[in-house]
Each structure stands twice: as structure tokens, then as C-alpha cells.
Amino acid sequence: MSYFPRTYAHLMRNVLAHNKGNIYLQIGTQLHDTQIKIRFNGVRYISRNHGGKQQHINTAPIEFTPNFGYGDRTSNCNKKVESTAMKTLRCTDDISTSSGSEATTDASTQLPFNVKLVDPMVRKSKRPSHAISEGLNMKTLKKKVIMPYLQLTKPRLTILVMLSAICSYALSPYPASVNELLCLTVGTTLCSGSANAINMGREPEFDRQMVRTQARPVVRGDVTPTQAFEFAALIGTLGVSILYFGVNPTVAILGASNIALYGWAYTSMKRKHIINTWLGALVGMVPPLMGWAAASPLSHPGSWCLAGLLFAWQFPHFNTLSHNIRNEYKNAGYVMTAWKNPLLNARVSLRYSILMFPLCFGLSYFNITDWYYQIDSGLINAWLTFWAFKFYWQQRINYSAKTLKDNVKFNKGLSVANIYARKTFMASVLHLPAILILAIIHKKGRWDWIYPGEAKRPQERF
């Protein structure tokens, strides 16, 4: 890496913070072989009117590109750039048009990069159309139109939802249909995308306060909340229609119910009560019911064992995820168990990890899988439970009366709990696909040609 990229990386590392007006700038860098670019990815400030709470006021970028030659290398360049930047790139509460233009001109002549100001009051979606239509091609079309709407659906989460429905359909003891499977896949995907788009459209002012969510399209201004709702209505209606006409009315009702449950009930409850986590777990258990109902009646207890697995899995997965970003949830105003009651958060993770054992046993007992499934699923459940127990036990020590009196010991114990939470989260990420894949491998009757004795056992047990 050349000297000048190191200089700008040094500026980024020192955050370029200016205290006047209590405004702080977060800087990110993009380093290329021929061009260096520094961007203000967001502006946060401390508001006295909000009790010192951190607020996020702008996510529109300010770009800096170099106007120097690489031959200009002096020993004092690093200090000169930093001191000049600190003097000229100041943010204050009172900004006038004249002073802003003078500062821009002054910065362009003294700093080794050009400054491109972006009006923070004008979101990208409200800027003149000619500003975005210049040089329009497939690349910009993908970036400006396709990708924002695709991101509204939370693709990775939607894929997981769709796969859970497919796995449940595959485990059904009744015959499968290719057309039915195709309609189930497309309809479930569209319903999940619709629910996620509603969720994003309702929470931009809160999402921009969290690092994990501040790059979402509605927060960036690529899509307005109204556009997000219109998109959600379109794909939601299409998804429910496909499920109704291509599968059956029961699956369509479940799909529509899940859109309402996630997009409205769960999203509304996130800022009111910790019960939102249980509502979110209910959302997770509906897709396996949809997959099962596509081929089999929901009266079969095996369907509820599968749904129970997805319900229970949500807690060790989400509770450990939220533990390590609990302060972000708190600052954004989300009422989560991770910061409201940290010990309960860990205890619930362990409780539902243990619940996986009888649920997997139920799959074999009700003839969905063979009995060999208990061996490998038991090992995977034990792995998840082990880390959930470590996380819970450390939190129990941390929040004991003795530890709470010793800040040094508490902070040290909290660092250990953070590690166990990450371990439990990673175990949960691998746990669910492993459990479902093994269930398909051990589906009842799949290996009867190797173990003919299995075929003679009773096939129905209710």
C-alpha cells in the first residue's frame, strides 16, 4: 500500500471528530489502485433535547476524491493533511450557504482531494430524475432499481424460509407433485419477501440507528416507505394467489397470516414488549406448516413436531445474536430481552435448546423418520445445548449478587459471555440445516431396501 492510502486510512482510524455543535462524523474508505475515495457514510450527533441520546441525522454520502499526484510526497504531508482537514471540514449546527461555499472552495485549494457535497435534506428518491438518468445502462439500472427492491425482501432470510417449507414438504409421508412443489416454492418466497418489505417500510427511522440495518434501501433513500408498501402488496397478492390456485386454500391462508403476523404484529411489538421474540418465533414455525399442508393434513402430529423445531430454534439463534448488539437495540428503542433481562435471555436460549431433543424424538415416534435419526440428531442437539449452557451459566455468574458488586469481575465475565454467545449463535446457524437435512436422509422408508425389517414396523402412530 502506498504512502497516501495509509494517510487517509489514518484519518479514518482517528474518525476526524469535531466537537463543535456536538457533531461527529463516521468515515469509511474505499481504496483502489488508481483512486482513493473517502466517504462520510453517516452523521451522528448528541442531542441535548434527547437526554444525550445518539441520533442519526443523515446517511447521504459526502465523497472525497484525490486531486494530487503520487509524486508529491513530503515528510510533513501526513500532519498537513490532518491539520488542514480538521480546520476546513467542520460541522456546526448553524450552516449558512455562503460559509458553506467558501469552506468548499477553501477545502478544494488546501486539501489534496475534491469535496462533493450532498444535500442532507434531499433523499436520493426525491432528487431530480435527470440526475440519475444520465448515462443509464444495465449496470445503473441494476444498482438503482433491481437491487434495492431485491434487498427489500431480505434475500438470505427469504431463502431460509423457503427451504424450511420445502424440507417440510419433502418429509410428508404423502406423494409429492412437481407442480405443487414449484407453486409452494414461488408462493412462499413471495409471501416472505412481502412481509420483509413491510417490515423495512415501517422502520427506517429506527433502522438507521443500528449499524446492522443502516444500509437497508429505505434507510438509504433508494426506496421510499410508500414504494416499499406498494411492492409488498404486489408480491404478497401474487404469492397468496399462487398458493391458493397452485397448492390449496389452507396454505394460502397460512401465507397471508404470516405476512400480517410478521409485517404488522411482530414489527409493532418490537418497540413495546419482549414478547416480540415469541411472536417472531411463531412466524418462523408457519413455513414448515405451509410445506406440510401442501401435501398432508395438519392433523398429523409430525407436522407440529417440525413446526416446533423451527419455533424452538429461533431462541438460541436470535437471543445470542441480539446479545452482542444489545446496546444498538436499546439505543434504537427496540425492547429486547437481551438488554431488558440478560439472564432471562440466556436461560430462554438454553431452555429451547433442550426442547430440541423431544421434538426430534417425536419425528421418529410418529414415523416421519427412522430411529437412527435419534443418534445423529442427538449429537447435533447436544452440541448446540452445550454452548447454550455455557452462555447461560456464565450469565448466571455475571448477574449474581457477588459479581455485581465487583465491576472488574463483572466486565471480565461479560467478555466471556460475549464469546459464548457468538459460539452459540454460530452453532445455531449450522444446527438447523443439519437437523433438516438429516431428517430427509432418515425419512421413514427411504432405506427399507437395506433394512427390510424397518418396513414391517407399524407405519401409523397417533
Curated annotation (Swiss-Prot):
Gene Ontology biological-process annotations: heme A biosynthetic process; heme O biosynthetic process
Activity regulation, per record: Positively regulated by the hydroxylated intermediate (heme I) formed at the subsequent step, or by HAS/COX15 itself.
Pathway assignment: Porphyrin-containing compound metabolism; heme O biosynthesis; heme O from protoheme: step 1/1
Cellular component GO terms held in the UniProt record: mitochondrial membrane; mitochondrion
Keyword Coiled coil: no
NCBIfam families: cyoE_ctaB
Family per record: Belongs to the UbiA prenyltransferase family.
Classification via PANTHER family: PROTOHEME IX FARNESYLTRANSFERASE, MITOCHONDRIAL (PTHR43448:SF2)
Protein function: Catalyzes the first reaction in the biosynthesis of heme A, a prosthetic group of mitochondrial cytochrome c oxidase (CcO). Heme A is synthesized from heme B by two sequential enzymatic reactions catalyzed by heme O synthase (HOS/COX10) and heme A synthase (HAS/COX15). HOS converts heme B (protoheme IX) to heme O by substitution of the vinyl group on carbon 2 of heme B porphyrin ring with a hydroxyethyl farnesyl side group.
Name of this chain's protein: Protoheme IX farnesyltransferase, mitochondrial
Organism: Saccharomyces cerevisiae (strain ATCC 204508 / S288c)
Source species taxonomy: Eukaryota, Fungi, Dikarya, Ascomycota, Saccharomycotina
